[in-house]
Amino acid sequence: MSQSTATYINVIGAGLAGSEAAYQIAKRGIPVKLYEMRGVKATPQHKTTNFAELVCSNSFRGDSLTNAVGLLKEEMRRLDSIIMRNGEANRVPAGGAMAVDREGYAESVTAELENHPLIEVIRDEITEIPDDAITVIATGPLTSDALAEKIHALNGGDGFYFYDAAAPIIDKSTIDMSKVYLKSRYDKGEAAYLNCPMTKEEFMAFHEALTTAEEAPLNSFEKEKYFEGCMPIEVMAKRGIKTMLYGPMKPVGLEYPDDYTGPRDGEFKTPYAVVQLRQDNTAGSLYNIVGFQTHLKWGEQKRVFQMIPGLENAEFVRYGVMHRNSYMDSPNLLTETFQSRRNPNLFFAGQMTGVEGYVESAASGLVAGINAARLFKREEALIFPQTTAIGSLPHYVTHADSKHFQPMNVNFGIIKELEGLRIRDKKERYEAIASRALADLDTCLASL
């Protein structure tokens, strides 16, 4: 397919990702047609017609460079992010986090984009993928059915799908490896899972805690997606004392290794129950809890799941969530610039690409917007270093295992490890990673 000869770029959706993409394109001197259906057609979760509206929390999370999202925000500031700039201008006290006056912030983003001389705001619902120009689609996790159908067809009918559950992901370095063992069920293939065995007593206590834990409330627009095919672990537990033993905690084929010295029920060779952890990234620094999609409150997840042997001190880089969410099979469909592999004139941004969170969504819009502009100018694509947060996030979502791909927040586990350095102190290690990231980003920008 040849490159479009249009004199403008389309951006569909004016959430965090679309707003950022539109600004980055216009900043580079290219006219933008920014489409937003709110004002013509409402959504269940938005309360206003403002751009970049925050529909849940007003927090952009931690602001320290020893926090991965704090590093990402600093990188975005250096890239002149409209979301970060207006967030700073509307900041409210929140301790070590960055929180904003949600209305003032959204109003200021809206005003800046509406008053930009190169941005034409069009309040209308888009139901077809435009073929008149380079286009960035940033329509969010609740993309309208009509447009979702078109994206589904574009991707061959199998690359755009609904998924409403995600299991917690933990930092491997915080797992007590003395209490777990590496094994695949029935020893099929390579030993690929970390197994957390439970005695009957441990399982009964865990079951009791799980069935009495407090769940997060569902929004009205989410209830329809609470279905049998993706049952939360706490719902499964409430169906019977042994239901989980025939599901994600099934011990069959996961016998203790000969050198196992932890607690066990008598001389049994197989644990009473097993929780499996599966590697979640290519670096092997992140593991998810297999089959543990959940809608428990985050504090309850930490309390209950830290009862699992080996996870007593586990750090969660992402808690489990249960919500309606549409996102793409990005590892098969997108490049690291969020460009479609099947239609090079098309970019995607925001949660539909598999990034999770306000800041991450805006960051994906920044990357997509810059690269849409570079494509328009027939310049080489800009891929940020994997040593940076803004480089590692698109790398993760476009190189993850497609079969088990789930949305991801930015975290230090997906950023390239330090080379030639082994820093035991976590704070010092994160500081070193952040220092390297900012230096590498500055070098990258200086070379442009």
UniProtKB/Swiss-Prot annotation:
Gene Ontology molecular-function annotations: flavin adenine dinucleotide binding; tRNA (uracil(54)-C5)-methyltransferase activity, 5,10-methylenetetrahydrofolate-dependent
Superkingdom, taxonomy of origin: Bacteria
Positions annotated to bind FAD: G13, A14, G15, L16, A17, G18
Entry EC no(s): 2.1.1.74
Keyword terms of this UniProt record: Cytoplasm, FAD, Flavoprotein, Methyltransferase, NAD, NADP, Transferase, tRNA processing
Protein localization: Cytoplasm
GO biological process, one term: tRNA methylation
Tagged with keyword Flavoprotein: yes
Pfam families per UniProt: GIDA
InterPro entries assigned to the protein according to its UniProt record, in alphabetical order: FAD/NAD-bd_sf, MnmG-rel, MnmG-rel_CS, MnmG_N, TrmFO
A cellular component annotation (GO) from this entry: cytosol
Cofactors named for this entry: FAD
Chief location of this protein within or outside the cell: cytoplasm
Catalysed transformations (reactions): uridine(54) in tRNA + (6R)-5,10-methylene-5,6,7,8-tetrahydrofolate + NADH + H(+) = 5-methyluridine(54) in tRNA + (6S)-5,6,7,8-tetrahydrofolate + NAD(+); uridine(54) in tRNA + (6R)-5,10-methylene-5,6,7,8-tetrahydrofolate + NADPH + H(+) = 5-methyluridine(54) in tRNA + (6S)-5,6,7,8-tetrahydrofolate + NADP(+)
NCBIfam families linked to this entry: gid_trmFO (TIGR00137), PRK05335.1 (NF003739)
Function according to Swiss-Prot or TrEMBL: Catalyzes the folate-dependent formation of 5-methyl-uridine at position 54 (M-5-U54) in all tRNAs.
Protein family membership: Belongs to the MnmG family. TrmFO subfamily.
Name the UniProt record assigns to this protein: Methylenetetrahydrofolate--tRNA-(uracil-5-)-methyltransferase TrmFO
The species this protein was found in: Streptococcus pyogenes serotype M2 (strain MGAS10270)
